[in-house]
Amino acid sequence: MRRNIAAICLLSAVLIINFYFRLFPTYFPQLKKEARGIVHKEIQKKIKNEINITSSDFNPLAKKQLLKRSVLKYERGNWSKIKKDIDRQYFELKSKYQDQNGQTYLMETDGWRWSGYTENVYRFGYPGDTIVNGKQIDGLILAPKGGEVVSYHFLFYLSAWLYKAFSYVNSSLPISIFLFYMPLFFVAVFLLVMYLFCLSRIGNLGAFISCLFVGLAPIFLSRSCVGWFDTDVLNLLFPLLVTWFYLNALTVKSPKARLGWLFLSSMLLGLFSFTWGYWWFILLIIIIFEIYSLVKIVLLPARYEARGVTLLKQRGFLVASFVILTLQFVFLFSGEAPFKALFLQIKGVMSLNSIFVVSVWPNVLATVSELRKTNLNEISDLIGSLPLVVVSLSFIFVLFLRTLRSKKYLGPQEETIGLLFVWSVCMLYACSKGARFTMFLLIPLGISLGWLLTETLRFYKKNFLITQVIRLLLIAFVLSSVYQANRVAKEIFPSMNNTWHNVLTKIKDNTPKNAILNSWWDYGDWIKIVAQRKVILDGQTQNIPQTYWMANVFITENEEEAIAILRMLNNGGNKAFEIIDRNVHDPFASLILLKKVLLVDKEKAKNILSEYLSQADQEAALELIFGKPSSKAYFLVAYSMLQIMPSISFLGNWDFIKVYLASALDNKDNGRSIECIEKLGVNKKQIKKFSKELALIRREDLSGWVSSKLSFKSKLSKSQEKDGIVLFDNGLIYLPKEKSAYLYINNSYQRPKSLFIFEQGILGEIVYPGDTLDFSTLIFKIGQDYYALMLDRELARSIFVRLYFLNGAGLKYFKPFIQEQEGLKYIRVFEIDWK
């Protein structure tokens, strides 16, 4: 009884602590402190100005003391007014992230798309906009035709069903608010399951520590707070349940019970395939664990005595049955889609960090920040603490060695330790491929930490001094976890804000319903759900050829090339390439040919294509490239693109000729490849130069050879001319009459590589020879204000810079349509004039 009461109390404490920090985005308590600081500074400024007038002849030290006393006196006498000012300021700060009803926006972009699918399930019974030939179709993605909805629908159906059930209790609550708080329900279920699993293995205190460690880990806390409507919590819940039930199947004695647990484990894994595309990772872990177990039985026969052969047969039958049942349940819940995607997914995981994957297209996933490579220090930052990570990993290894040497760990403990060890090793490898996978280390590390505490207390239970030290360490762990969670929770804000919402609402209100929005994939889900308009790219379709083409539009200096690519995309996505390639039968050559066609007029393009395409395909390709799109189209640029420009430019600068040569070298067919691309009209000297470079470059350095990253070196700065000089806060000095610029760096004035000046609709460049900095400066004037920023020279004339900073001045195909800004941060939408 006392154990049950302790379990309830500790579980309640875990839930309360976890809920408290996950509710921060509801009311943003961190902004209350910021509001107090702003009001206090305003009071100080006001009183300081008064003192400078009334006591201007006072000594500075006296003024400082007078200011301090006056502020204190004012705050004591006007606390009621100050409190109102703080509340007003606090409301202004947090309302930036909330709609007109005070409801915080969803946290990340994927959640907007999932909420749209969930609303469709609630209203129509299925997530797509329409059903075509039995397939769910989302009409707003992959414009102009639309695309198939992702195959994993469990989140949408579960959330819609729960909302329907909740509506019987409260029918007035909008589904959007219900979905905002949905992560709390998922977290509660996950922590309950985690606690019960740990309780069955390591007791109450160990379960408490494990759940606190996992629940408050920075990577998990930030991805499971209110407003984070995604599958992240379910992606931990299902593997934990599958593992628990599978371990039960291994350790129960009754054959019927064993089959029952096996059935439940397989069914949950099948349901997991209906939840997340990478469901198979836990199946792979279990298979590797079983291979290890079978090898151990064979190599350590004395450990299992006469049961070895029988155990070998039982385990072989069990794992075979598990795999067969799982595959059947996967097919039952998700159909053929997971099997079709499985090979490509495994191949994709192996090449996550490689831009160059011997493919015609660059690997977009390698540019996504959460899929970057990690080291132990970064893993520790995402999980919480380097010492705790090292201790947890070390203890898993120690437990694993004990299972090999001691019969003390036979049965459930041996199986649990073995599976956790395999899980940890597999996820450490996965973490080396992408930071996102760090979250899947939490379960084995958390259980290991709780297990360590339980084992240590059991071993030293008769030593009063050591027991007290352990209790103090336990208190320190709880306090440090809470402190860390508070720090992380304060940094959680939605990526959506009122500026973005205003732009998207204006798009919805002022564009035709069949309009297409062209922009980077980061904004696709917002445009689709809030503006309700078609998009070329979004977060779920980022790793497709259209991403390369869009990146090319942003960084090209040639407006004619940009509009040609946009025509092609808005007419048929990547279909023009597909038509050419089915005639040429060489994707590299097809791309080189297509890029050549995009740079010429229709008549020249016709002559080029006539040599390679049939008449019908030639006409179809020309219509896609040169035909006027049937839908109105708009182009969006935003301030957040400045930070990701290295990734965008790397994709856009992808050199297919270099890739073609490298691929041919791998296939030992370099001579034939050179002959092919020469036939396509590629400069022979350039090919010869590339071939010589390729012979000198290592395989692991190829991605740095086939492309290059461009970036902005500073934020946009604003200033005015005074005495013939413009001083910017970034250290730049500009002399308008001389048209020269200097940057104060390392106690000396240095010139940029070149100076770009935009005036009278013309973007001119002044090149500074000799020893200069390795970047350029762009300066332009609006009214009496001068604006400046530092950037790579190759970016200065790009379409992105011309649109974002110069508002499309001097361009003929992009007409300003909508603009919103926060200080010097802009979101601009342009109407594309196809004429």
Predicted regions and their residues:
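Transmembrane-lumen/periplasm boundary regions of multi-pass, lipid-linked membrane glycan transferases
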Residues: 41-42, 53-66, 72, 76-90, ...
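Alpha-helical transmembrane segments
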Residues: 6-18, 267, 321-327
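Helix-to-loop transition at the C-terminal end of transmembrane segments
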Residues: 19-36, 96-107, 332-345, 487-489
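Extracytoplasmic
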Residues: 8-91, 463-835
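Membrane-embedded helix bundles of polyisoprenyl
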Residues: 134-136, 181-200, 205-254, 258-294, ...
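Active-site lumenal/periplasmic loops and adjacent helix-entry segments of GT-C-fold
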Residues: 69, 73-197, 206-213, 217-238
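Hydrophobic/aromatic-rich transmembrane helices and adjacent perimembrane loops
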Residues: 281, 426, 430-464, 468
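Membrane-interfacial entry segments at the cytosolic side of transmembrane helices
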Residues: 3-5, 257-259, 304-323, 412, ...
